[in-house]
């Protein structure tokens, strides 16, 4: 999905799904699924921050955990360090198979060959094919900082033990070397040596999040999933944490998957943004392109809610009607059609495919891929920002 040559890819997520089974009845039989993540693809490159945004319940946090295999996926793959040649082949194979990945009832010879090649690539690159020993080796390279700094740290452990635990688990260095490394990590996140001998409850929320960041850095990772790292903090403390994360990225070349519902923070931190709705990606683009010209009606509604720090400037607010459907019973066709101000008849019947709308800008919306483009009168406000959008790139 990310075609512009830049830094090498650390993780390539392809068609990942995570369904949580619903059980009911006398024998607790399987009666349905909660489709938390439903066919998501994205790339995270070296030294790059990818923002992942969407309303609460859209599947952002679940996706972050599935990518790192903290939660096992239902299907799909996360490829670690695929070469440019493998990346090109992956995209070609997935495109040839379509959304069903060749899982039709009567697979053709072509789809069978593609599936076989994908299986061979997955055996070499996919995290989900690694055994426990190989996954442990990768844990140090792929880390996560959790949203809640109050519950992510053990209350019974000293800071010295919390930050040093990854080093002990991976048998890194001698005891003295580990202690020295812990001290360096605390200094990198702005804490002092005397903090080594304190318990987490003795710190503020911002200080606890610094401890969580130090722990994630212990094994010198290549990528960190940041699961709303500032949402539980005061605004002044948020700025401090974001500055630390930016500095660490500049110094160490870290890749971030930055999960947040705070769009202004995502704009400041990210190079690319992925927008999710009800388990699906609806739009992905470079940050400047997404914020200057959002194409999907859902993205437009999200951005219209950002406050403007100028009382003389007004922006038309796009207010969505209705509630978010349940991921246990998503609507047919486009999942956003029940709330979309630009809905068309095709939207409730056919699920839109990702359409290229410019350099690295993709949108899943029938407004840009369907000949049926006559929107209802009430859609004028929602489409105002997309009227000058470029035509689809073939």
How would you label these PLM feature ranges?
Residues 176-194:
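Conserved ABC ATPase "signature" region
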